[in-house]
């Protein structure tokens, strides 16, 4: 399977070839369609802003959909996509923990405790109504993560993240940090609540459109 190193080289090669895709706003992008790789590094390009990651995870844990509740203030990107009420869809903590979305984290944990070999341990982030939910009240937030499947194989917990869209510069770093955090929490819960003891397995990243925007081409060229 491809690794982050391979993905990094793919984008460098595509930039050298000037293999561009023009997005809906007329901006050049480099895109990899149907990407699948081991998310074995924290970042593909650039460095992780761990201070922001911690604040975003705290906001996810709050399950609030209001961007004003992000500790330290909401980044401009969240403000730009929020509704007229300051709300978004993509609070990932709400997606997996909230009773409004069927407490999926707990369903997955209980499934794996009852059947460690299960293929049904899936946390579903998006929903069919996203086609109309994404732009309600002036919002522009079509959730990027589709689902995450968890499997126990060879006594290790593995996760497969399935996304419709992911920016290789900022999106990947923050999303990977969240998914690694959730995977660690699930592992701890399985080990503390069940009779078996598992290790941390692989984190696989699958993306319909893995892309980088023109404004970040300089990071690729480095």
What are the roles of these predicted feature ranges?
Residues 1-222:
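Terminal, non-catalytic protein-protein interaction segments that mediate quaternary/complex assembly
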């Amino acid at each position: 399977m491809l690794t982050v190193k391979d993905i990094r080289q793919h984008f460098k090669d595509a930039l050298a070839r000037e293999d561009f895709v023009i997005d809906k706003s007329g901006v050049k992008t480099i895109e990899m369609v149907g990407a699948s790789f081991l998310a074995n590094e924290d970042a593909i390009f650039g460095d992780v802003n761990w201070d922001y990651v911690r604040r975003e995870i705290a906001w996810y844990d709050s399950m609030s959909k209001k961007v004003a509740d992000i500790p330290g203030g909401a980044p401009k990107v969240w403000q730009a996509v929020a509704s007229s009420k300051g709300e978004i869809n993509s609070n990932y903590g709400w997606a997996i923990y909230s009773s409004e979305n069927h407490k999926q984290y707990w369903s997955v944990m209980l499934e794996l405790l009852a059947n460690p070999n299960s293929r049904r341990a899936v946390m579903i982030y998006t929903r069919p109504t996203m086609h109309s939910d994404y732009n309600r009240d002036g919002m522009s937030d079509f959730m990027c993560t589709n689902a995450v499947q968890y499997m126990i194989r060879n006594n290790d917990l593995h996760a497969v993240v399935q996304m419709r869209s992911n920016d290789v510069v900022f999106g990947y770093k923050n999303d990977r940090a969240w998914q690694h955090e959730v995977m660690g929490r699930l592992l701890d819960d399985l080990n503390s609540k069940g009779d078996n003891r598992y290790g941390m397995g692989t984190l696989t990243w699958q993306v319909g459109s893995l892309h980088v925007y023109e404004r970040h081409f300089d990071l690729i060229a480095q």
